[in-house]
């Protein structure tokens, strides 16, 4: 099914290369590869709450165990950062070395890693990165998020956000959005995305995903 969604909330941000996006329960965090930083903001007011320097920002961002995890560096490693101190507390290698890791999301299921070149999203054990399962995607993966029932990924060039049913791995919905989505995040009601084209964080409502 194909569906077109207009944004219900737009937040302009001071960023030149919007990459990653994650929701921590109260704040949206986004990463900017041009300014090499990770930024927290209040989605209600748009107020910036914190800026953390992060050299080598590449693509997506997630939060787990009270820390942030950013895809960073030439080899797209998983860099774990303490959001309070801004210090790097750990680095793990790209689970598929040499491939284009773009999407990253930590959920109760495990750690999701999405690859643009392979068109796959892997679910991995967050402790040792052991592969649990793999979902094939129809489009290149730019960013990843998940609810309890659905896995969602962004296609930057196709300007779509696509939903996969976690029960059977079928792609059930393709949502056409404004701009070019990169990082995406689900806040329990809305799917937010980084619009690379207009330097904004934008939110859409997707039928059937709210509360899922």
Where are these regions (language model features)?
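WD40 beta-propeller blade core
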Residues: 39, 79, 119-122, 162, ...
């Amino acid at each position: 099914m194909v569906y077109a969604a207009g944004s219900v909330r737009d937040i302009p941000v001071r960023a030149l290369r919007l990459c990653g996006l994650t929701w921590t329960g109260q704040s949206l965090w986004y990463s900017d590869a041009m300014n090499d930083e990770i930024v927290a903001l209040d989605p209600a007011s748009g107020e910036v709450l914190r800026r953390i320097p992060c050299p080598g920002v590449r693509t997506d961002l997630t939060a787990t165990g009270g820390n942030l995890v950013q895809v960073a560096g030439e080899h797209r490693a998983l860099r774990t950062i303490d959001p309070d101190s801004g210090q790097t507390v750990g680095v793990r290698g790209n689970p598929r070395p040499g491939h284009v890791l773009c999407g990253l999301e930590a959920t109760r299921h495990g750690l999701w890693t999405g690859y643009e070149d392979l068109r796959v999203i892997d679910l991995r054990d967050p402790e040792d990165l052991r592969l649990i399962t793999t979902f094939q995607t129809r489009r290149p993966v730019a960013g990843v998020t998940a609810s309890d029932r659905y896995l969602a990924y962004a296609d930057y060039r196709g300007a779509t956000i696509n939903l996969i049913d976690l029960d059977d791995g079928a792609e059930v919905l393709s949502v056409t959005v404004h701009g070019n989505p990169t990082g995406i995040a689900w806040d329990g009601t809305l799917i937010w995305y980084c619009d690379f084209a207009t330097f904004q964080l934008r939110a859409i409502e997707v039928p059937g995903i709210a509360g899922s």
